[in-house]
Amino acid sequence: MTAKLIDGKAIAASLRQQIAKRVAERSQQGLRTPGLAVILVGSDPASQVYVSHKRKDCEEVGFISQAYDLPAETTQTALTDLIDRLNEDAAVDGILLQLPLPAHLDASLLLERIRPDKDVDGFHPYNVGRLAQRIPLLRPCTPKGIITLLESTGVDLYGLDAVVVGASNIVGRPMAMELLLAGCTVTVTHRFTKDLAGHVGRADLVVVAAGKPGLIKGEWIKPGAIVIDVGINRQDDGKLVGDVVYETALPRAGWITPVPGGVGPMTRACLLENTLYAAETLHD
């Protein structure tokens, strides 16, 4: 048995087409074009690449993209003032603060400063709290994208044993809440969990977001399980690999996401989806 691939690139492209179509329809109806403000502080190379992709995505679907590229020495006060201005700007439906920030800035305070109805990353405690209470509004992009990928398989998630590896605020914790919402029985683990192999081995669905290449061995995977690999790690030879040993997981899993081309494109597409949702449902 060889796993079926979950093609995040293709699913994300289809989602972007749907969003672009809706933006065009809004324009024909005389409605406002959705707007996304993207804030980049400093010159971290990876962040610059991510931000350029997000701005390109905005152009593709017809959003108005506002770019704020700030020097690394930008103060907490200056950034707070910018967020306050964007909060009050009716042309802005979403505010994205690219992480990580320079060490002297308090990311938690700044993320909380973004108005919850413009928090298209889904990081604000209000939006995380709504997800926990089973009334999601703006959902964290990576877990939301993963749910879309899982839905594309046609597999009924209700009642599945799901194991999340990694407990970050950005992926692991909200992912667990999304899977609970989908009716899974969820276990959250991390790289220091005792008998991690045992937990993974009984899972019908494994979502791995630990940031450690090759952490999950292919032989640990339960035959036929769904494997979602969120990890993206660059090796010395420049090759990108996930947190799962792909070559040995492929013959055991039922479904698997590739790295790259799996979860990453969906995270970006869901940022656009959240921005459109904010424009239509929260701001129109």
From Swiss-Prot:
<comment type="subunit">
    <text>Homodimer.</text>
</comment>
<protein>
    <recommendedName>
        <fullName>Bifunctional protein FolD 1</fullName>
        <ecNumber>1.5.1.5</ecNumber>
        <ecNumber>3.5.4.9</ecNumber>
    </recommendedName>
</protein>
<keyword id="KW-0028">Amino-acid biosynthesis</keyword>
<dbReference type="GO" id="GO:0000105">
    <property type="term" value="P:L-histidine biosynthetic process"/>
</dbReference>
<keyword id="KW-0378">Hydrolase</keyword>
<keyword id="KW-0560">Oxidoreductase</keyword>
<dbReference type="Pfam" id="PF02882">
    <property type="entry name" value="THF_DHG_CYH_C"/>
</dbReference>
<dbReference type="InterPro" id="IPR020630">
    <property type="entry name" value="THF_DH/CycHdrlase_cat_dom"/>
</dbReference>
<comment type="function">
    <text>Catalyzes the oxidation of 5,10-methylenetetrahydrofolate to 5,10-methenyltetrahydrofolate and then the hydrolysis of 5,10-methenyltetrahydrofolate to 10-formyltetrahydrofolate.</text>
</comment>
<keyword id="KW-0554">One-carbon metabolism</keyword>
<feature type="binding site">
    <location>
        <position position="232"/>
    </location>
    <ligand>
        <name>NADP(+)</name>
    </ligand>
</feature>
<dbReference type="GO" id="GO:0009086">
    <property type="term" value="P:methionine biosynthetic process"/>
</dbReference>
<keyword id="KW-0658">Purine biosynthesis</keyword>
<keyword id="KW-0521">NADP</keyword>
<dbReference type="InterPro" id="IPR046346">
    <property type="entry name" value="Aminoacid_DH-like_N_sf"/>
</dbReference>
<keyword id="KW-0486">Methionine biosynthesis</keyword>
<dbReference type="InterPro" id="IPR020631">
    <property type="entry name" value="THF_DH/CycHdrlase_NAD-bd_dom"/>
</dbReference>
<dbReference type="GO" id="GO:0006164">
    <property type="term" value="P:purine nucleotide biosynthetic process"/>
</dbReference>
<feature type="binding site">
    <location>
        <begin position="166"/>
        <end position="168"/>
    </location>
    <ligand>
        <name>NADP(+)</name>
    </ligand>
</feature>
<dbReference type="GO" id="GO:0004477">
    <property type="term" value="F:methenyltetrahydrofolate cyclohydrolase activity"/>
</dbReference>
<dbReference type="InterPro" id="IPR000672">
    <property type="entry name" value="THF_DH/CycHdrlase"/>
</dbReference>
<keyword id="KW-0511">Multifunctional enzyme</keyword>
<comment type="similarity">
    <text>Belongs to the tetrahydrofolate dehydrogenase/cyclohydrolase family.</text>
</comment>
<comment type="pathway">
    <text>One-carbon metabolism; tetrahydrofolate interconversion.</text>
</comment>
<dbReference type="GO" id="GO:0004488">
    <property type="term" value="F:methylenetetrahydrofolate dehydrogenase (NADP+) activity"/>
</dbReference>
<dbReference type="GO" id="GO:0035999">
    <property type="term" value="P:tetrahydrofolate interconversion"/>
</dbReference>
<dbReference type="Pfam" id="PF00763">
    <property type="entry name" value="THF_DHG_CYH"/>
</dbReference>
<dbReference type="GO" id="GO:0005829">
    <property type="term" value="C:cytosol"/>
</dbReference>
<dbReference type="InterPro" id="IPR036291">
    <property type="entry name" value="NAD(P)-bd_dom_sf"/>
</dbReference>
<keyword id="KW-0368">Histidine biosynthesis</keyword>
